[in-house]
Structures are given as structure tokens and as C-alpha cells.
Amino acid sequence: MRQQFLGALIGAAFGTVFVLVNSGDPLPSAIGWVLRALAVVALAAVVVLGVRAGGRPTLEGRPMFGPSYRVIVIGEVVLLVAGFFVLSLLDAPVQANVAWIATVVGLHFVALASAWKARSILVVGVVLTVLGVVGLALLGSAAAWVPFVSGVLSGVTLLGGSLYGVRRA
């Protein structure tokens, strides 16, 4: 399996989870189910396009999942755990968790864009980070919408970025 396809598949899988988990209230039920179905279709499209692309090399032979990737993922885990701890100390609403996850995952992609010298994922990273920060800002006034803003829209961003990446491969 090509490394770039594996990366797109991981992004699409997490994007699908973001949409599946966060497409509930305050969205109308029918819209939530449509969003969930579209996310699954997008994930399937990433799989089909990735398999059809075959074994073409990517990233000019550089390893995607080398030492820099591992350092970034370890940093991501530390930030997630520390952030959840701080949010619990602050008695933040449960919706804060998805906003924090989106923020940290966005920063993860920004760091990966630099490590991999792949500007295409920088856009995904910046958008996810912004959606996470907006979700955190909404906690004081519209917490019910945080799962949509930081969850569903982040999932759509990951799925779109994965489709873009696998089409370019």
C-alpha cells in the first residue's frame, strides 16, 4: 500500500468518525443522517480511488511515517491528554472535547506539512485548527453548535483533503 494512500485513508477514516459522531443535535435528524451517509460514501471513494491509483511512488521516495511523524504524533497525544485534563479542571462543557480534538489534529497537520514538505495538507491543518478554535470560542454562547462546527465541519475537511490527496496520487 502506497504511503500517500495510507495517509489519505487514515485522514478519511478519522473524518468519517468526526461526522458520524457529531451529526446529532442541534441538527435536524434527517440532515444528520444525510451527512453520515455522505461521509461513508466519501470514505468509500477514497478507498476506491486509492486502490485504482496503484503503486505509483509519492513524496519523492521520502518516508511519510518516519521519525518526524512519530515525534509529531507523540506531541499530539501529549497535547490531547493535557488539554482534556485542563478542560476537566475548568469544568468545561463536554462539547469542548471535540473542539480541542479538532484544534490539536489541525496543529498535527500543520506540523506534518512542514515535516513532509507537503503544502497540500497545510490547508487541512489550518482549517481544522480554525474550526477547533472557533468551537472553543462558541462554548460560552452556543455550545450546542460546537459538535457541528468543530466535529462535522472538521470531518468534512478531512474527507475533502483525503479525496484531494488520493486524486493527486
Annotated model-derived regions:
Residues 20-33, 85-96, 138-146:
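Helix-coil boundary and interhelical linker segments in multi-pass alpha-helical membrane proteins
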Residues 32-44, 87-103, 150-153:
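Structural signature of hydrophobic alpha-helical transmembrane segments
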Residues 121-169:
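Terminal transmembrane helical module of multi-pass membrane proteins
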Residues 10-14, 73-85, 127-129:
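Core segments of transmembrane alpha-helices
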Residues 81-126:
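Membrane-proximal helix-loop-helix units in multi-pass membrane proteins
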Residues 1-22:
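The first (N-terminal) embedded transmembrane alpha-helix
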Residues 17-74:
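Selected alpha-helical membrane-embedding segments in polytopic membrane proteins
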Residues 48-63, 107-116, 160-169:
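C-terminal ends of transmembrane helices
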